[in-house]
Amino acid sequence: MSNTTSALPSSVPAVSLDPNATLCQDWEQSHHLLFHLANLSLGLGFLIPTTLALHMIFLRLLLMTGCSLFIAWATLYRCTLDVMVWNVVFLLVNFMHFFFLLYKRRPIKIDRELKSVYKRMFEPLHVREALFQRLTGQFCTIQTLKKGQVYAAEDKTSVDERLSILLKGKMKVSYRGHFLHNIYTNAFIDSPEFRSTQMNRGERFQVTIAAEENCKLLCWSRERLTYFLESESFLNEVFRYLIGKDITNKLYSLNDPTLSDKAVKKMDRQPSLCSQLSMMQMRNSMASTSDTDDVLNQILRGGSTGSSLQKNPLTKTSTTMKPIEEGLEDDVFESESPTTSQNVSKTTKKDI
């Protein structure tokens, strides 16, 4: 029986394994240490958090390290040309990107005369050095004025030409020979006029601006600066904020011309009573008119706000906003009448 069963052909064919087949029979030994170090550097590069400031630079460094180790492993221990060529290509690409990142982070050297303006006005608003250099390097000039020279003449100089910041010195603003306020270092010279030209073109200065000391100015071409700010939305918002703040400082110094340089820089003082009254008149005038830009122009031109608005027939009173009552402040300057003095004496007698 056993002989017959052994003579029968087997129904299951024998499996013949080709040594070139994909199924692994004998695993090769582990590769050299360089191979593992190369993969480790690639893995560390991909694990760097993106919140890190130098994330891209560290990533490129680790990728270049991994490619270099792969090149050494393929050349010295495996002798595989294709692996070596591909990693050389990857190494060159990463090196070019790494060099570009270093070039972008190079220190920008700002001119010594402009450094104080950048530190005081633009750096607190997160304007980078490269953007500030573009702003000051293309279409602006540094001009000098000697003591007594006029920057703008009343009713003569056009306001459409330039926008300037005072870098050094001190300037005086006057209207028809009457002193209005001073302009100190790191402040716009003609910010109110720049604001007014955005609404009305072809106007002239309504004040005279002259140098009280030897001055240095940073001047932009008005037209070219406007085109540049249209393409840089962030910088446009920065300029709007700086000019608005400068106009506010000029309003305070206009109401209190005795402000010193330190007081203008700090602007944390409480206005005096006279300053509060004049500011109250300005706010009443702006609250009782519908066109606040016209009121602002009239204020900055040096005229009396209340009288100019009363004489102007074009101003319309607002139905939604009422002027602020000034009765309490006006009582401070009123002299005592006989009736009030008698009432006061009666109350004192009763108290006694």
From Swiss-Prot:
Keywords: cAMP, cAMP-binding, Cell adhesion, Cell junction, Cell membrane, Developmental protein, Glycoprotein, Membrane, Nucleotide-binding, Tight junction, Transmembrane, Transmembrane helix. The chain crosses the membrane at residues 39-59, 61-81, 83-103. GO terms for biological process: bicellular tight junction assembly; cell-cell junction organization; epiboly; epithelial cell-cell adhesion; epithelium development; establishment of skin barrier; eye photoreceptor cell development; heart contraction. Residues 1-38, 82 are extracellular. The keyword Metal-binding does not apply. Disruption phenotype: Morpholino knockdown of the protein causes cardiac edema in 70% of the injected morphants. They show malformed myotendinous junction and, in 80% of the morphants, skeletal muscle is characterized by myofibrillar misalignment and fiber detachment. Pfam families: POPDC1-3 (PF04831). Cell adhesion molecule involved in the establishment and/or maintenance of cell integrity. Involved in skeletal muscle and heart development as well as in the maintenance of heart function. May play a role in vamp3-mediated vesicular transport and recycling of receptor molecules. Involved in the formation and regulation of the tight junction (TJ) paracellular permeability barrier in epithelial cells. May induce primordial adhesive contact and aggregation of epithelial cells in a Ca(2+)-independent manner. May be involved in epithelial movement during corneal sheet formation and regeneration. This is Popeye domain-containing protein 1. It comes from Danio rerio (Zebrafish).
